[in-house]
């Protein structure tokens, strides 16, 4: 799942960069999130260990490789997730729901003045949705499909939460990056397979997703 997520965001980093207007329009959110996830991917590529050990490797690598504000927030989210998955050989939707809650708490603590309408909001409302459906008897694939749908719905509303985004007629870059990561994970869970790396180019699916967030 981590490899697929890392590949997906690497493929779409340039498109994410184009959305980057907050907190400063430096056009590097996609790059920073991609480089951060690449560190996690490298840590577990060809790794065949258990869930806990895999999660620990990813979290440690992300913390060491976190780039920029978005990368640091992402790395701390995964650190919180890892703490909740510790000791598990496999994870159910209920386990993932607790992990997402832990990830959000960890990410929010890292930001002195959290701003709504950013990736933090997308993460938080995604975790809230996870808690709502955790015990509904759905599969992991159905669970992540619900989370992705929720994240996209929240992302579409970010311009209404943050005036800078509305003025630029874009959605939040970090929030889009988080959606792209979930999309990569879901691809593995729902049987479509691991997304291949085509760094430097955008997949047709990715382009379609971005087109759906045209705020003009």
Report each predicted region and the residues it spans:
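N-terminal loops that bind phosphate or other acidic moieties
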Residues: 1-216
């Amino acid at each position: 799942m981590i490899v697929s997520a890392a590949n997906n965001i690497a493929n779409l980093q340039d498109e994410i960069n184009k959305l980057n207007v907050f907190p400063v329009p430096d056009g590097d959110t996609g790059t920073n999130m991609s480089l951060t996830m690449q560190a996690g991917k490298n840590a577990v590529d060809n790794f065949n260990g258990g869930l806990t050990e895999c999660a620990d490797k990813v979290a440690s690598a992300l913390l060491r490789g976190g780039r920029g504000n978005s990368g640091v927030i992402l790395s701390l989210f995964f650190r919180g997730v890892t703490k909740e998955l510790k000791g598990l050989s496999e994870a159910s939707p209920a386990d993932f729901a607790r992990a997402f809650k832990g990830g959000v708490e960890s990410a929010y603590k890292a930001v002195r003045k959290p701003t709504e309408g950013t990736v933090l909001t997308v993460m938080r409302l995604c975790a809230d949705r996870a808690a709502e459906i955790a015990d509904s008897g759905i599969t992991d694939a159905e669970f992540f499909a619900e989370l992705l749908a929720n994240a996209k719905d929240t992302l579409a509303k970010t311009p209404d939460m943050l005036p800078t985004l509305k003025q630029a007629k874009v959605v939040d870059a970090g929030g889009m990056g988080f959606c792209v990561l979930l999309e990569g994970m879901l691809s593995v869970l729902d049987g479509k397979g691991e997304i291949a790396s085509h760094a430097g180019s955008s997949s047709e699916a990715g382009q379609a997703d971005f087109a759906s967030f045209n705020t003009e």
